[in-house]
């Protein structure tokens, strides 16, 4: 995957209008995917959904046309969360499911995430096969004609029904005041409805998509307004999703952020308490040391995977475990789904709160996260400053400075032309200084 031209850690992503996020490329991609999937006497259908970006509809259409030219039909679902595509692909036994989305990025970006027949994200091997086919694809004739075989379907209610089935029939959120930020994305017509149906009093944010405002000053990457509204309305908690609904971040009644590490801890504790925890839990290289320490106190095994929710899934399947998460808010609960699902993860937390008559703040009391600073440094796609001796030296010095009481992680982003720098430790002032020293070293060799 690291040598792929198009696929990153989570599908394909980029700037709209620049290769590969163009109608022409999406047509070719659909044609290649169709050729790989087409089988005689098979269902030969692919689900396609999108988030609320204005570019999504033309990209979806050209993708569907490319699939048609290879013999596959498309079911166009419209605006729907990415995890819904995963579920519905498996539920309908489609040959594949495709979400046209750039997740938590702004509307100037778009991309795709592809799911196989079992609802899981594509393996590295299959992504590589697609890359090879794309590289060998001869220029398609401009006058190529094929019947565009697609059907528009509304499957939102089926997904709502599925989400509701993941918690007890007896769950009652009456009396809970919840602020919900849907990032002007694809959860806007689902999450508020679900929570109201369960009895909650819902205050809505980010529920007015216009094609251009997805993730803009809202959602999981910008929770300042959510925090403000939780405090203003004296709400019990706040929930933020990202643009395509596969991430969740929460806010407690005091305005504290509750991230993917804490959500994972809460769910693990509940399952342990009810003797339903099968083995241990999986985090990633980015998971906070505080999570590892808290789980160790409970004697719950903990393993770190590579960054990316599909690698969390791979490790869960390898270990035979059921729950894992990224601190960014991708939470995988294999009892229910095989990909990160913000709505389902949120429902589990609300169910735990309701049945224990407690607060989100109280559920987080057993985990103390270390201060952690994240810095992104823009680079050219071909540039790799991580190979620089200057950068290697500053990392070595910084690790000695932490003296075993923290972690340093530098990596190239799998979705954007960035170097991501993470420094974590007990002393906040120290890690801030170390992180900026490393960032300056990276910038000096770009």
UniProtKB/Swiss-Prot annotation:
Its cofactor is Mg(2+). It is an enzyme of class 5 (isomerase). Mg(2+) binds at residues 103, 242, 244, 246. One of its GO terms (biological process) is UDP-N-acetylglucosamine biosynthetic process. The keyword Nucleus does not apply. Its EC number is 5.4.2.10. The keyword Magnesium applies. Keywords: Isomerase, Magnesium, Metal-binding, Phosphoprotein. GO terms for molecular function: magnesium ion binding; phosphoglucosamine mutase activity; phosphomannomutase activity. It catalyses: alpha-D-glucosamine 1-phosphate = D-glucosamine 6-phosphate. The modification Phosphoserine is found at residue 103. The active site is at 103 (phosphoserine intermediate). Belongs to the phosphohexose mutase family. Catalyzes the conversion of glucosamine-6-phosphate to glucosamine-1-phosphate. This is Phosphoglucosamine mutase. It comes from Wigglesworthia glossinidia brevipalpis. The gene is glmM.
